[in-house]
A protein has these predicted regions:
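Terminal connector regions
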Residues: 56-101, 105, 167-196
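Short acidic, flexible loop segments centered on an aromatic residue
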Residues: 7-26, 127-142
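Beta-sheet-dominated interaction scaffolds and their linkers
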Residues: 1-5, 103-115, 151
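Extracytoplasmic
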Residues: 9-11, 46-48, 64-66, 89-91, ...
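Soluble periplasmic/extracytoplasmic beta-strand elements of cell-envelope proteins
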Residues: 13-17, 48-52, 68-70, 93-95
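Intrinsically disordered, low-complexity segments enriched in serine, threonine, and glycine
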Residues: 116-196
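Intrinsically disordered, low-complexity Pro/Gly/Ser/Thr-rich segments with frequent PxxP/GP/PP motifs
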Residues: 24-57, 141-168
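Buried hydrophobic-core signal for structured, non-transmembrane domains
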Residues: 1-5, 51, 67-72, 119-124
């Protein structure tokens, strides 16, 4: 359950939705069901949104699944027509772990990092969702790179931004894993695999 508070001075309409990611099935796979999907919240009041785990057919029960849950507020425009009010949207990461999957507190140890041309590539070899700070540092040049996204789904491979290019041959890199509770873990240093 997620509690959403309206700390503003006007009522808002709260819309809650689940967004699929790159490895979701192309069809509908309602992994999480939100209730209520829409609700009015008056100033100083709260709304509880229940996040329920569904069991869609064909769901891979050998690996973790991740979805983004969005909470979007739509402000009441009131009676004045010449006002500007801004919609805000907040994203929360929701990860479902199959009961048969053993807990792993450091799944980032299974990441496979390598040079790919003038960029860096990382593959998640585990059945776990791995979250990372998007910035990595390549050694010995101390060059900064930014990953395409701040997470890797099981079996997924991502690279660094296309605008980031290596200036010298790298031998290792530093990255910052993010724990299941959203906290940054101290930097990890790994050796880079040879170019393939």
């Amino acid at each position: 359950t997620v509690r959403v508070d309206n700390i503003g001075n006007y009522p808002v309409l709260l819309f809650s939705s689940v967004v699929k990611n790159a490895l979701s099935k192309q069809g509908e796979d309602p992994l999480f069901i939100l209730s209520p999907p829409a609700a009015r919240i008056d100033p100083g009041k709260s709304q509880l949104v229940r996040v329920m785990l569904a069991d869609p057919p064909g769901l891979d029960k050998t690996r973790q699944q991740m979805r983004h849950i969005y909470f979007q507020e739509i402000p009441d425009m009131g009676e004045k027509s010449n006002q500007l009010k801004v919609n805000t949207r907040h994203r929360v990461v929701a990860i479902a772990t199959p009961s048969a999957l053993v807990e792993n507190k450091s799944p980032w140890q299974t990441l496979h990092w390598q040079q790919n041309g003038h960029s860096i590539q990382v593959k998640n070899l585990s059945p776990y969702v791995i979250r990372l700070a998007p910035s990595i540092t390549v050694q010995p040049s101390n060059q900064q790179f930014v990953l395409e996204q701040p997470y890797l789904l099981p079996g997924q491979t991502i690279g660094t931004r296309k605008s980031d290019r290596l200036t010298s041959p790298p031998s290792r890199l530093h990255f910052t894993p993010i724990s299941n509770t959203g906290r940054a873990i101290p930097d990890i240093t790994v050796n880079l695999a040879p170019i393939q």
